[in-house]
């Protein structure tokens, strides 16, 4: 398959594309510092709730530093429950999923909800779609010179809203991407790897509560000694040890197996 602009996943422009991971031991539970007190004096006007934009097509300007304003158009896939200000977005022409606080980020300007809605499509092979979720795969990309570039990764889930697309991540570049993988499979560009001989996870008793890291803070020490902080925003249902992480200094969504890396 060809990617937009002839780029394979790892050719995105961003810092720290391949750091090793985040240790589960670095997790810190988020604490609340709110104080409860009685309000005295004039009350503040109640702000009107914002429109739910999940599933909507949007466009907005983007300005970083002293650079020019660029225009972006895409689809809002999800609003993150543990941080309702944060939205997951699939921008037109880009394969990775972005996480932005659309109403708070000062780099975002002139946010507009477009009238066109995302068309619903029927999955061509529901059984195959269910079969590939949680599986290791080899994904072939066509480079600019026509050669094939193989990327090994894992299919994480069906993407929300855009229901013929799938969330996937790669060993070489552990961030969240989405592709129409059924088409790639039928074209011979996606191969599902045989299941490993790893022992299956222990079955849980009915009603048993399993600790989740969702909502917890993470801290990652970079090679230069500096630290980056973020939050665990999602647990992958098909692989419960795998989580999505949104770092404060990056708009990409990172994908880590926090049991394996601990």
UniProtKB/Swiss-Prot annotation:
Q: Which InterPro entries match?
A: SPIN/Ssty, SPIN/Ssty_sf
Q: Does the keyword Nucleotide-binding apply?
A: no
Write the record's keywords in alphabetical order, separated by commas: Cell cycle, Nucleus
- Highest taxon of the source? Eukaryota
Its tissue distribution reads: Expressed in several tissues including testis.
Question: Where is composition skewed (Basic residues) in this entry?
Answer: 27-38
GO terms, biological process: gamete generation
Cellular component GO terms, alphabetically? nucleus
Specify where the region named Disordered lies, as residue ranges. 1-50
The record ties this protein, via Gene3D superfamilies, to: Spindlin/Ssty (2.80.10.70)
Subcellular location per UniProt equals: Nucleus
Q: What family does the entry list?
A: Belongs to the SPIN/STSY family.
**Function summary:** May play a role in mitosis.
Q: What is this protein called?
A: Spindlin-Z
Q: Which organism is it from?
A: Gallus gallus
The organism's lineage is:
Eukaryota, Metazoa, Chordata, Craniata, Vertebrata
């Amino acid at each position: 398959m060809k990617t937009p602009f002839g780029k394979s996943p790892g050719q995105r422009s961003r810092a720290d594309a391949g750091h090793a991971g985040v240790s589960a031991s670095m997790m810190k539970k988020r604490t609340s510092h709110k104080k409860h007190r009685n309000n005295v004096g004039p009350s503040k006007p109640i702000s009107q709730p914002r429109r739910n934009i999940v599933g909507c097509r949007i466009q907005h300007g983007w300005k970083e530093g002293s650079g020019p304003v660029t225009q972006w158009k895409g689809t809002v896939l999800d609003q993150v429950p543990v941080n309702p200000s944060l939205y997951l977005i699939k921008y037109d022409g880009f394969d990775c999923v972005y996480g932005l606080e659309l109403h708070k980020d000062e780099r975002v300007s002139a946010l507009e909800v477009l009238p066109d809605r995302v068309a619903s499509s029927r999955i061509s092979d529901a059984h195959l779609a269910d079969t590939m979720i949680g599986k290791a795969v080899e994904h072939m990309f066509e480079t600019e010179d026509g050669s094939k570039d193989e990327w090994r990764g894992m299919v994480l889930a069906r993407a929300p809203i855009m229901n013929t697309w799938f969330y996937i991540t790669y060993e070489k570049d552990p961030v969240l991407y989405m592709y129409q993988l059924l088409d790639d499979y039928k074209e011979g560009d996606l191969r599902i790897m045989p299941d490993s001989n790893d022992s299956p996870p222990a079955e849980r008793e009915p009603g048993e509560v399993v600790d989740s890291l969702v909502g917890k803070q993470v801290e990652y020490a970079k090679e230069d000694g500096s630290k980056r902080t973020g939050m665990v925003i999602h647990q992958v249902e098909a692989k419960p040890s795998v989580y999505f992480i949104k770092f404060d200094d990056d708009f990409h969504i990172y994908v880590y197996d926090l049991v394996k890396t601990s």
